[in-house]
A protein has these predicted regions:
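Short, charged/polar "capping" segments at the starts of alpha-helices
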Residues: 14, 84, 181-185
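Glycine-rich beta-strand-centered segment in the early N-terminal region that forms part
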Residues: 26-44, 52-96
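Short N-terminal binding/cap micro-motifs at the start of the first secondary-structure element
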Residues: 11-18, 46-47
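NAD(P)H dinucleotide-binding glycine-rich loop of Rossmann-like/cofactor-binding domains
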Residues: 68-75, 85-152
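Short glycine/threonine/proline-enriched tight-turn/helix- or strand-capping micro-motif at secondary-structure
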Residues: 15-26, 55
């Protein structure tokens, strides 16, 4: 049995329980090039809210009546993708469900899964951490001694950018956050 949350209505403002529907049924069998992943962890990233909008934000919008899209982590339990055999621990784009069926290209194998806490692959070692690293070092070209300004300093990506900048030898790291509570968090928790 697969339990999953479907998006049935586009949220207006903060999502409400009535925007979702709970469904139980069999997991969809994988098609050619697809895998079924038993979802162990779901990243509850703020980006999901944008994917619920008709514009999809920077991503294809979640179709109404479909499972809510999210970054998930778990083992492959069925595979029609030779790159991801059954038993491979993966992280990628799945859904709010017990089992996510999706193209194998949506997932990457988790390397050295036995050497790290698995949830780390959803944040610092996963898409959020890769985004922070790519933005800071590949796009911005940060070098030792640079001063770094981080917008969205208390968010998932921003908080990691700040830590990477400090560890990378930035001379100064300054964070921008929305409001006194987030600014206090930036200083007291993230050490700006």
């Amino acid at each position: 049995t697969n339990r999953e949350w479907l998006l049935v209505k586009r949220p207006q403002g903060l999502p409400q329980r009535s925007d979702y529907e709970w469904r139980e049924g069999p997991a969809r069998a994988p098609g050619e090039g697809e895998v079924v992943v038993r979802v162990l962890y779901i990243a509850m990233d703020p980006a999901i809210r944008g994917w619920m909008d008709p514009s999809g934000n920077y991503f294809t919008p979640i179709p109404l009546g479909s499972p809510v899209t999210a970054v998930v982590l778990g083992p492959v339990v069925e595979s029609r993708d030779p790159r991801l055999p059954v038993g491979t621990m993966v992280c990628g784009l799945g859904s709010w469900s017990d089992y996510a069926t999706a193209p194998g290209l949506f997932f990457n194998p988790v390397v050295d899964a036995d050497q790290h806490d698995l949830v780390a692959f959803l944040h610092p070692l996963g898409p959020v951490g890769l985004t922070a690293h790519y933005g800071l070092f590949d796009r911005a070209g940060m070098k030792k001694g640079d001063a770094v300004l981080v917008s969205g300093a208390t968010g998932g990506v921003g908080s990691l950018v700040a830590q990477m900048a400090r560890l990378g030898g930035a001379s100064k790291v300054v964070g921008i956050a929305g409001g006194p509570v987030k600014c206090r968090q930036a200083v007291e928790v993230f050490g700006y």
